[in-house]
């Protein structure tokens, strides 16, 4: 495992640095590192680290979501109002609809199997989007119009919505009835996540005011609580649950509301943690990619992904109708909502592991979506934000 950690960090950072020098997103180099070092090519990564890959990827996601919460300016989000709510589910719903229209004909799968594929593909990647929106907020691009806040909040809730749909469709194909409680749980889990996270943030702000400890210790406390929330969500067996990822982001928001100076300092600390977490996240996502699968569906999978993205971007366009955003700002939001990586890597292989007939197709299309959209979406954002968004 020690050799694997060394390879992940050294090779991942080096190839990422080379990509950055070539004006490409560093995550592209990290993804390529994972593909090459992973079990489907050179097989240099130890099985023990691949065995905890999902947990390590989740820790990385926790780090960037907490950092996002610590720096999120809610005043910009309040200005936008209605579109902020619509961005949480309309683009994902339209993408799912697009896949339902085209996938059964092209890939020869049933409507329910297409719904499972759509639920896997319809999530935007917080691991790609969130750090870039945090960067935009720090540099002041689009903040007055609330663009990074809108995309950041929408992308986080979008994932929760899609994962609940995925669980529901998976249950249906295994013979369970589609219970209304599953759909009622979507808004409830989001609101409970907001409430629980904000309350914890406020309590921590009060605690940090009364008990003087180092900022590093504060980070460890917040990180530990975040991990506990994830474990609690995973182990809850009741029909109504809460979203741990949204709760984690709102811990940062609650802390920021009560102790802004502390939140700013902790955001810097989390930024340093993200340097290592980003490498692990994208190298391990790359390690899940089985290149051999891709040749099996090839062009048809490409068409499905392209149609899905067109439907998704149209969904973003609809959400932003009636806002004060200009054409360039809307186009940026549409591009920012295209990258896929985290959720697809986390749930793309579940149908195959359950022995479903559509499992291999779902995993293949998910893998192709990661390889194509994560670097392309990141590249589009990195290249366009200074041209498309206003500073200050």
Predicted regions and their residues:
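Transmembrane helical cores of multi-pass secondary ion antiporters/exchangers
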Residues: 1-392
